[in-house]
Amino acid sequence: PAIPRFPRHISYDLVLFGSWRRKGVYIGDGRQIASPGSYPVAGFNFAPMYNLGYKFRVGASLDGVYDGSANVYTYMEDYIVDSNGNGTPPPRQFLKPGIQHQLSLGVSGRAEYVMPYFTIGVGIGANVLGRGDLRGLYQILALKIGITRSTFLHIGYNLQNFQTPNYLMLGLGFRFHNKYPK
């Protein structure tokens, strides 16, 4: 049978995701220690994607993230040591900044390879709003698993500055204006 001509079009992907992460915190002398708990991560991606053919999509994405571990810092109270060097340091406290230091909004370029039940996507972007830990470039690798014609499971990973593991993305996606042939 003949393969019908592909109708090039723009579709819109909306992904809502959540996750958790652990974090290392710098303690001043360049060393890191593990923060004692895990932190929530939640976000969204809104991506208009140009469908070039049966196998390839490209587009841009608006990416919003709440990262509960962003800009966490450690604090230790001063303590007195006697002349013999005796003294017990108090435990370190891990402090979270206000929510304005844990939100970011970024823009990324995306490319996706489309298969019958799966789509593999990559992206690179930069946060345009975000403070401290949330500044800089980020990279995304994602797997979309089709559930219905317009919904999919989204499993992805986010790196920061091509080296630092950031967070896992586990979510649900919706595709609007999908003219992909049935």
Task: For the regions a language model picked out, list residue spans one by one.
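Flexible, solvent-exposed loop segments that connect beta-strands
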Residues: 26-35, 68-99
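Repeated loop/turn-to-beta-strand initiation elements of outer-membrane beta-barrel proteins
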Residues: 55-58, 115-120, 145-155, 178-182
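Outer-membrane beta-barrel "beta-signal"
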Residues: 1, 165-182
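Residue-level detector of the transmembrane beta-barrel scaffold of outer-membrane proteins
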Residues: 11-15, 57-59, 110, 119-121, ...
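Surface-exposed strand-loop-strand hairpins of Gram-negative outer-membrane beta-barrel proteins
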Residues: 20-45
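Residues on the lipid-exposed face of transmembrane beta-strands in outer-membrane beta-barrel proteins
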Residues: 16-18, 44-50, 107-113, 141-147, ...
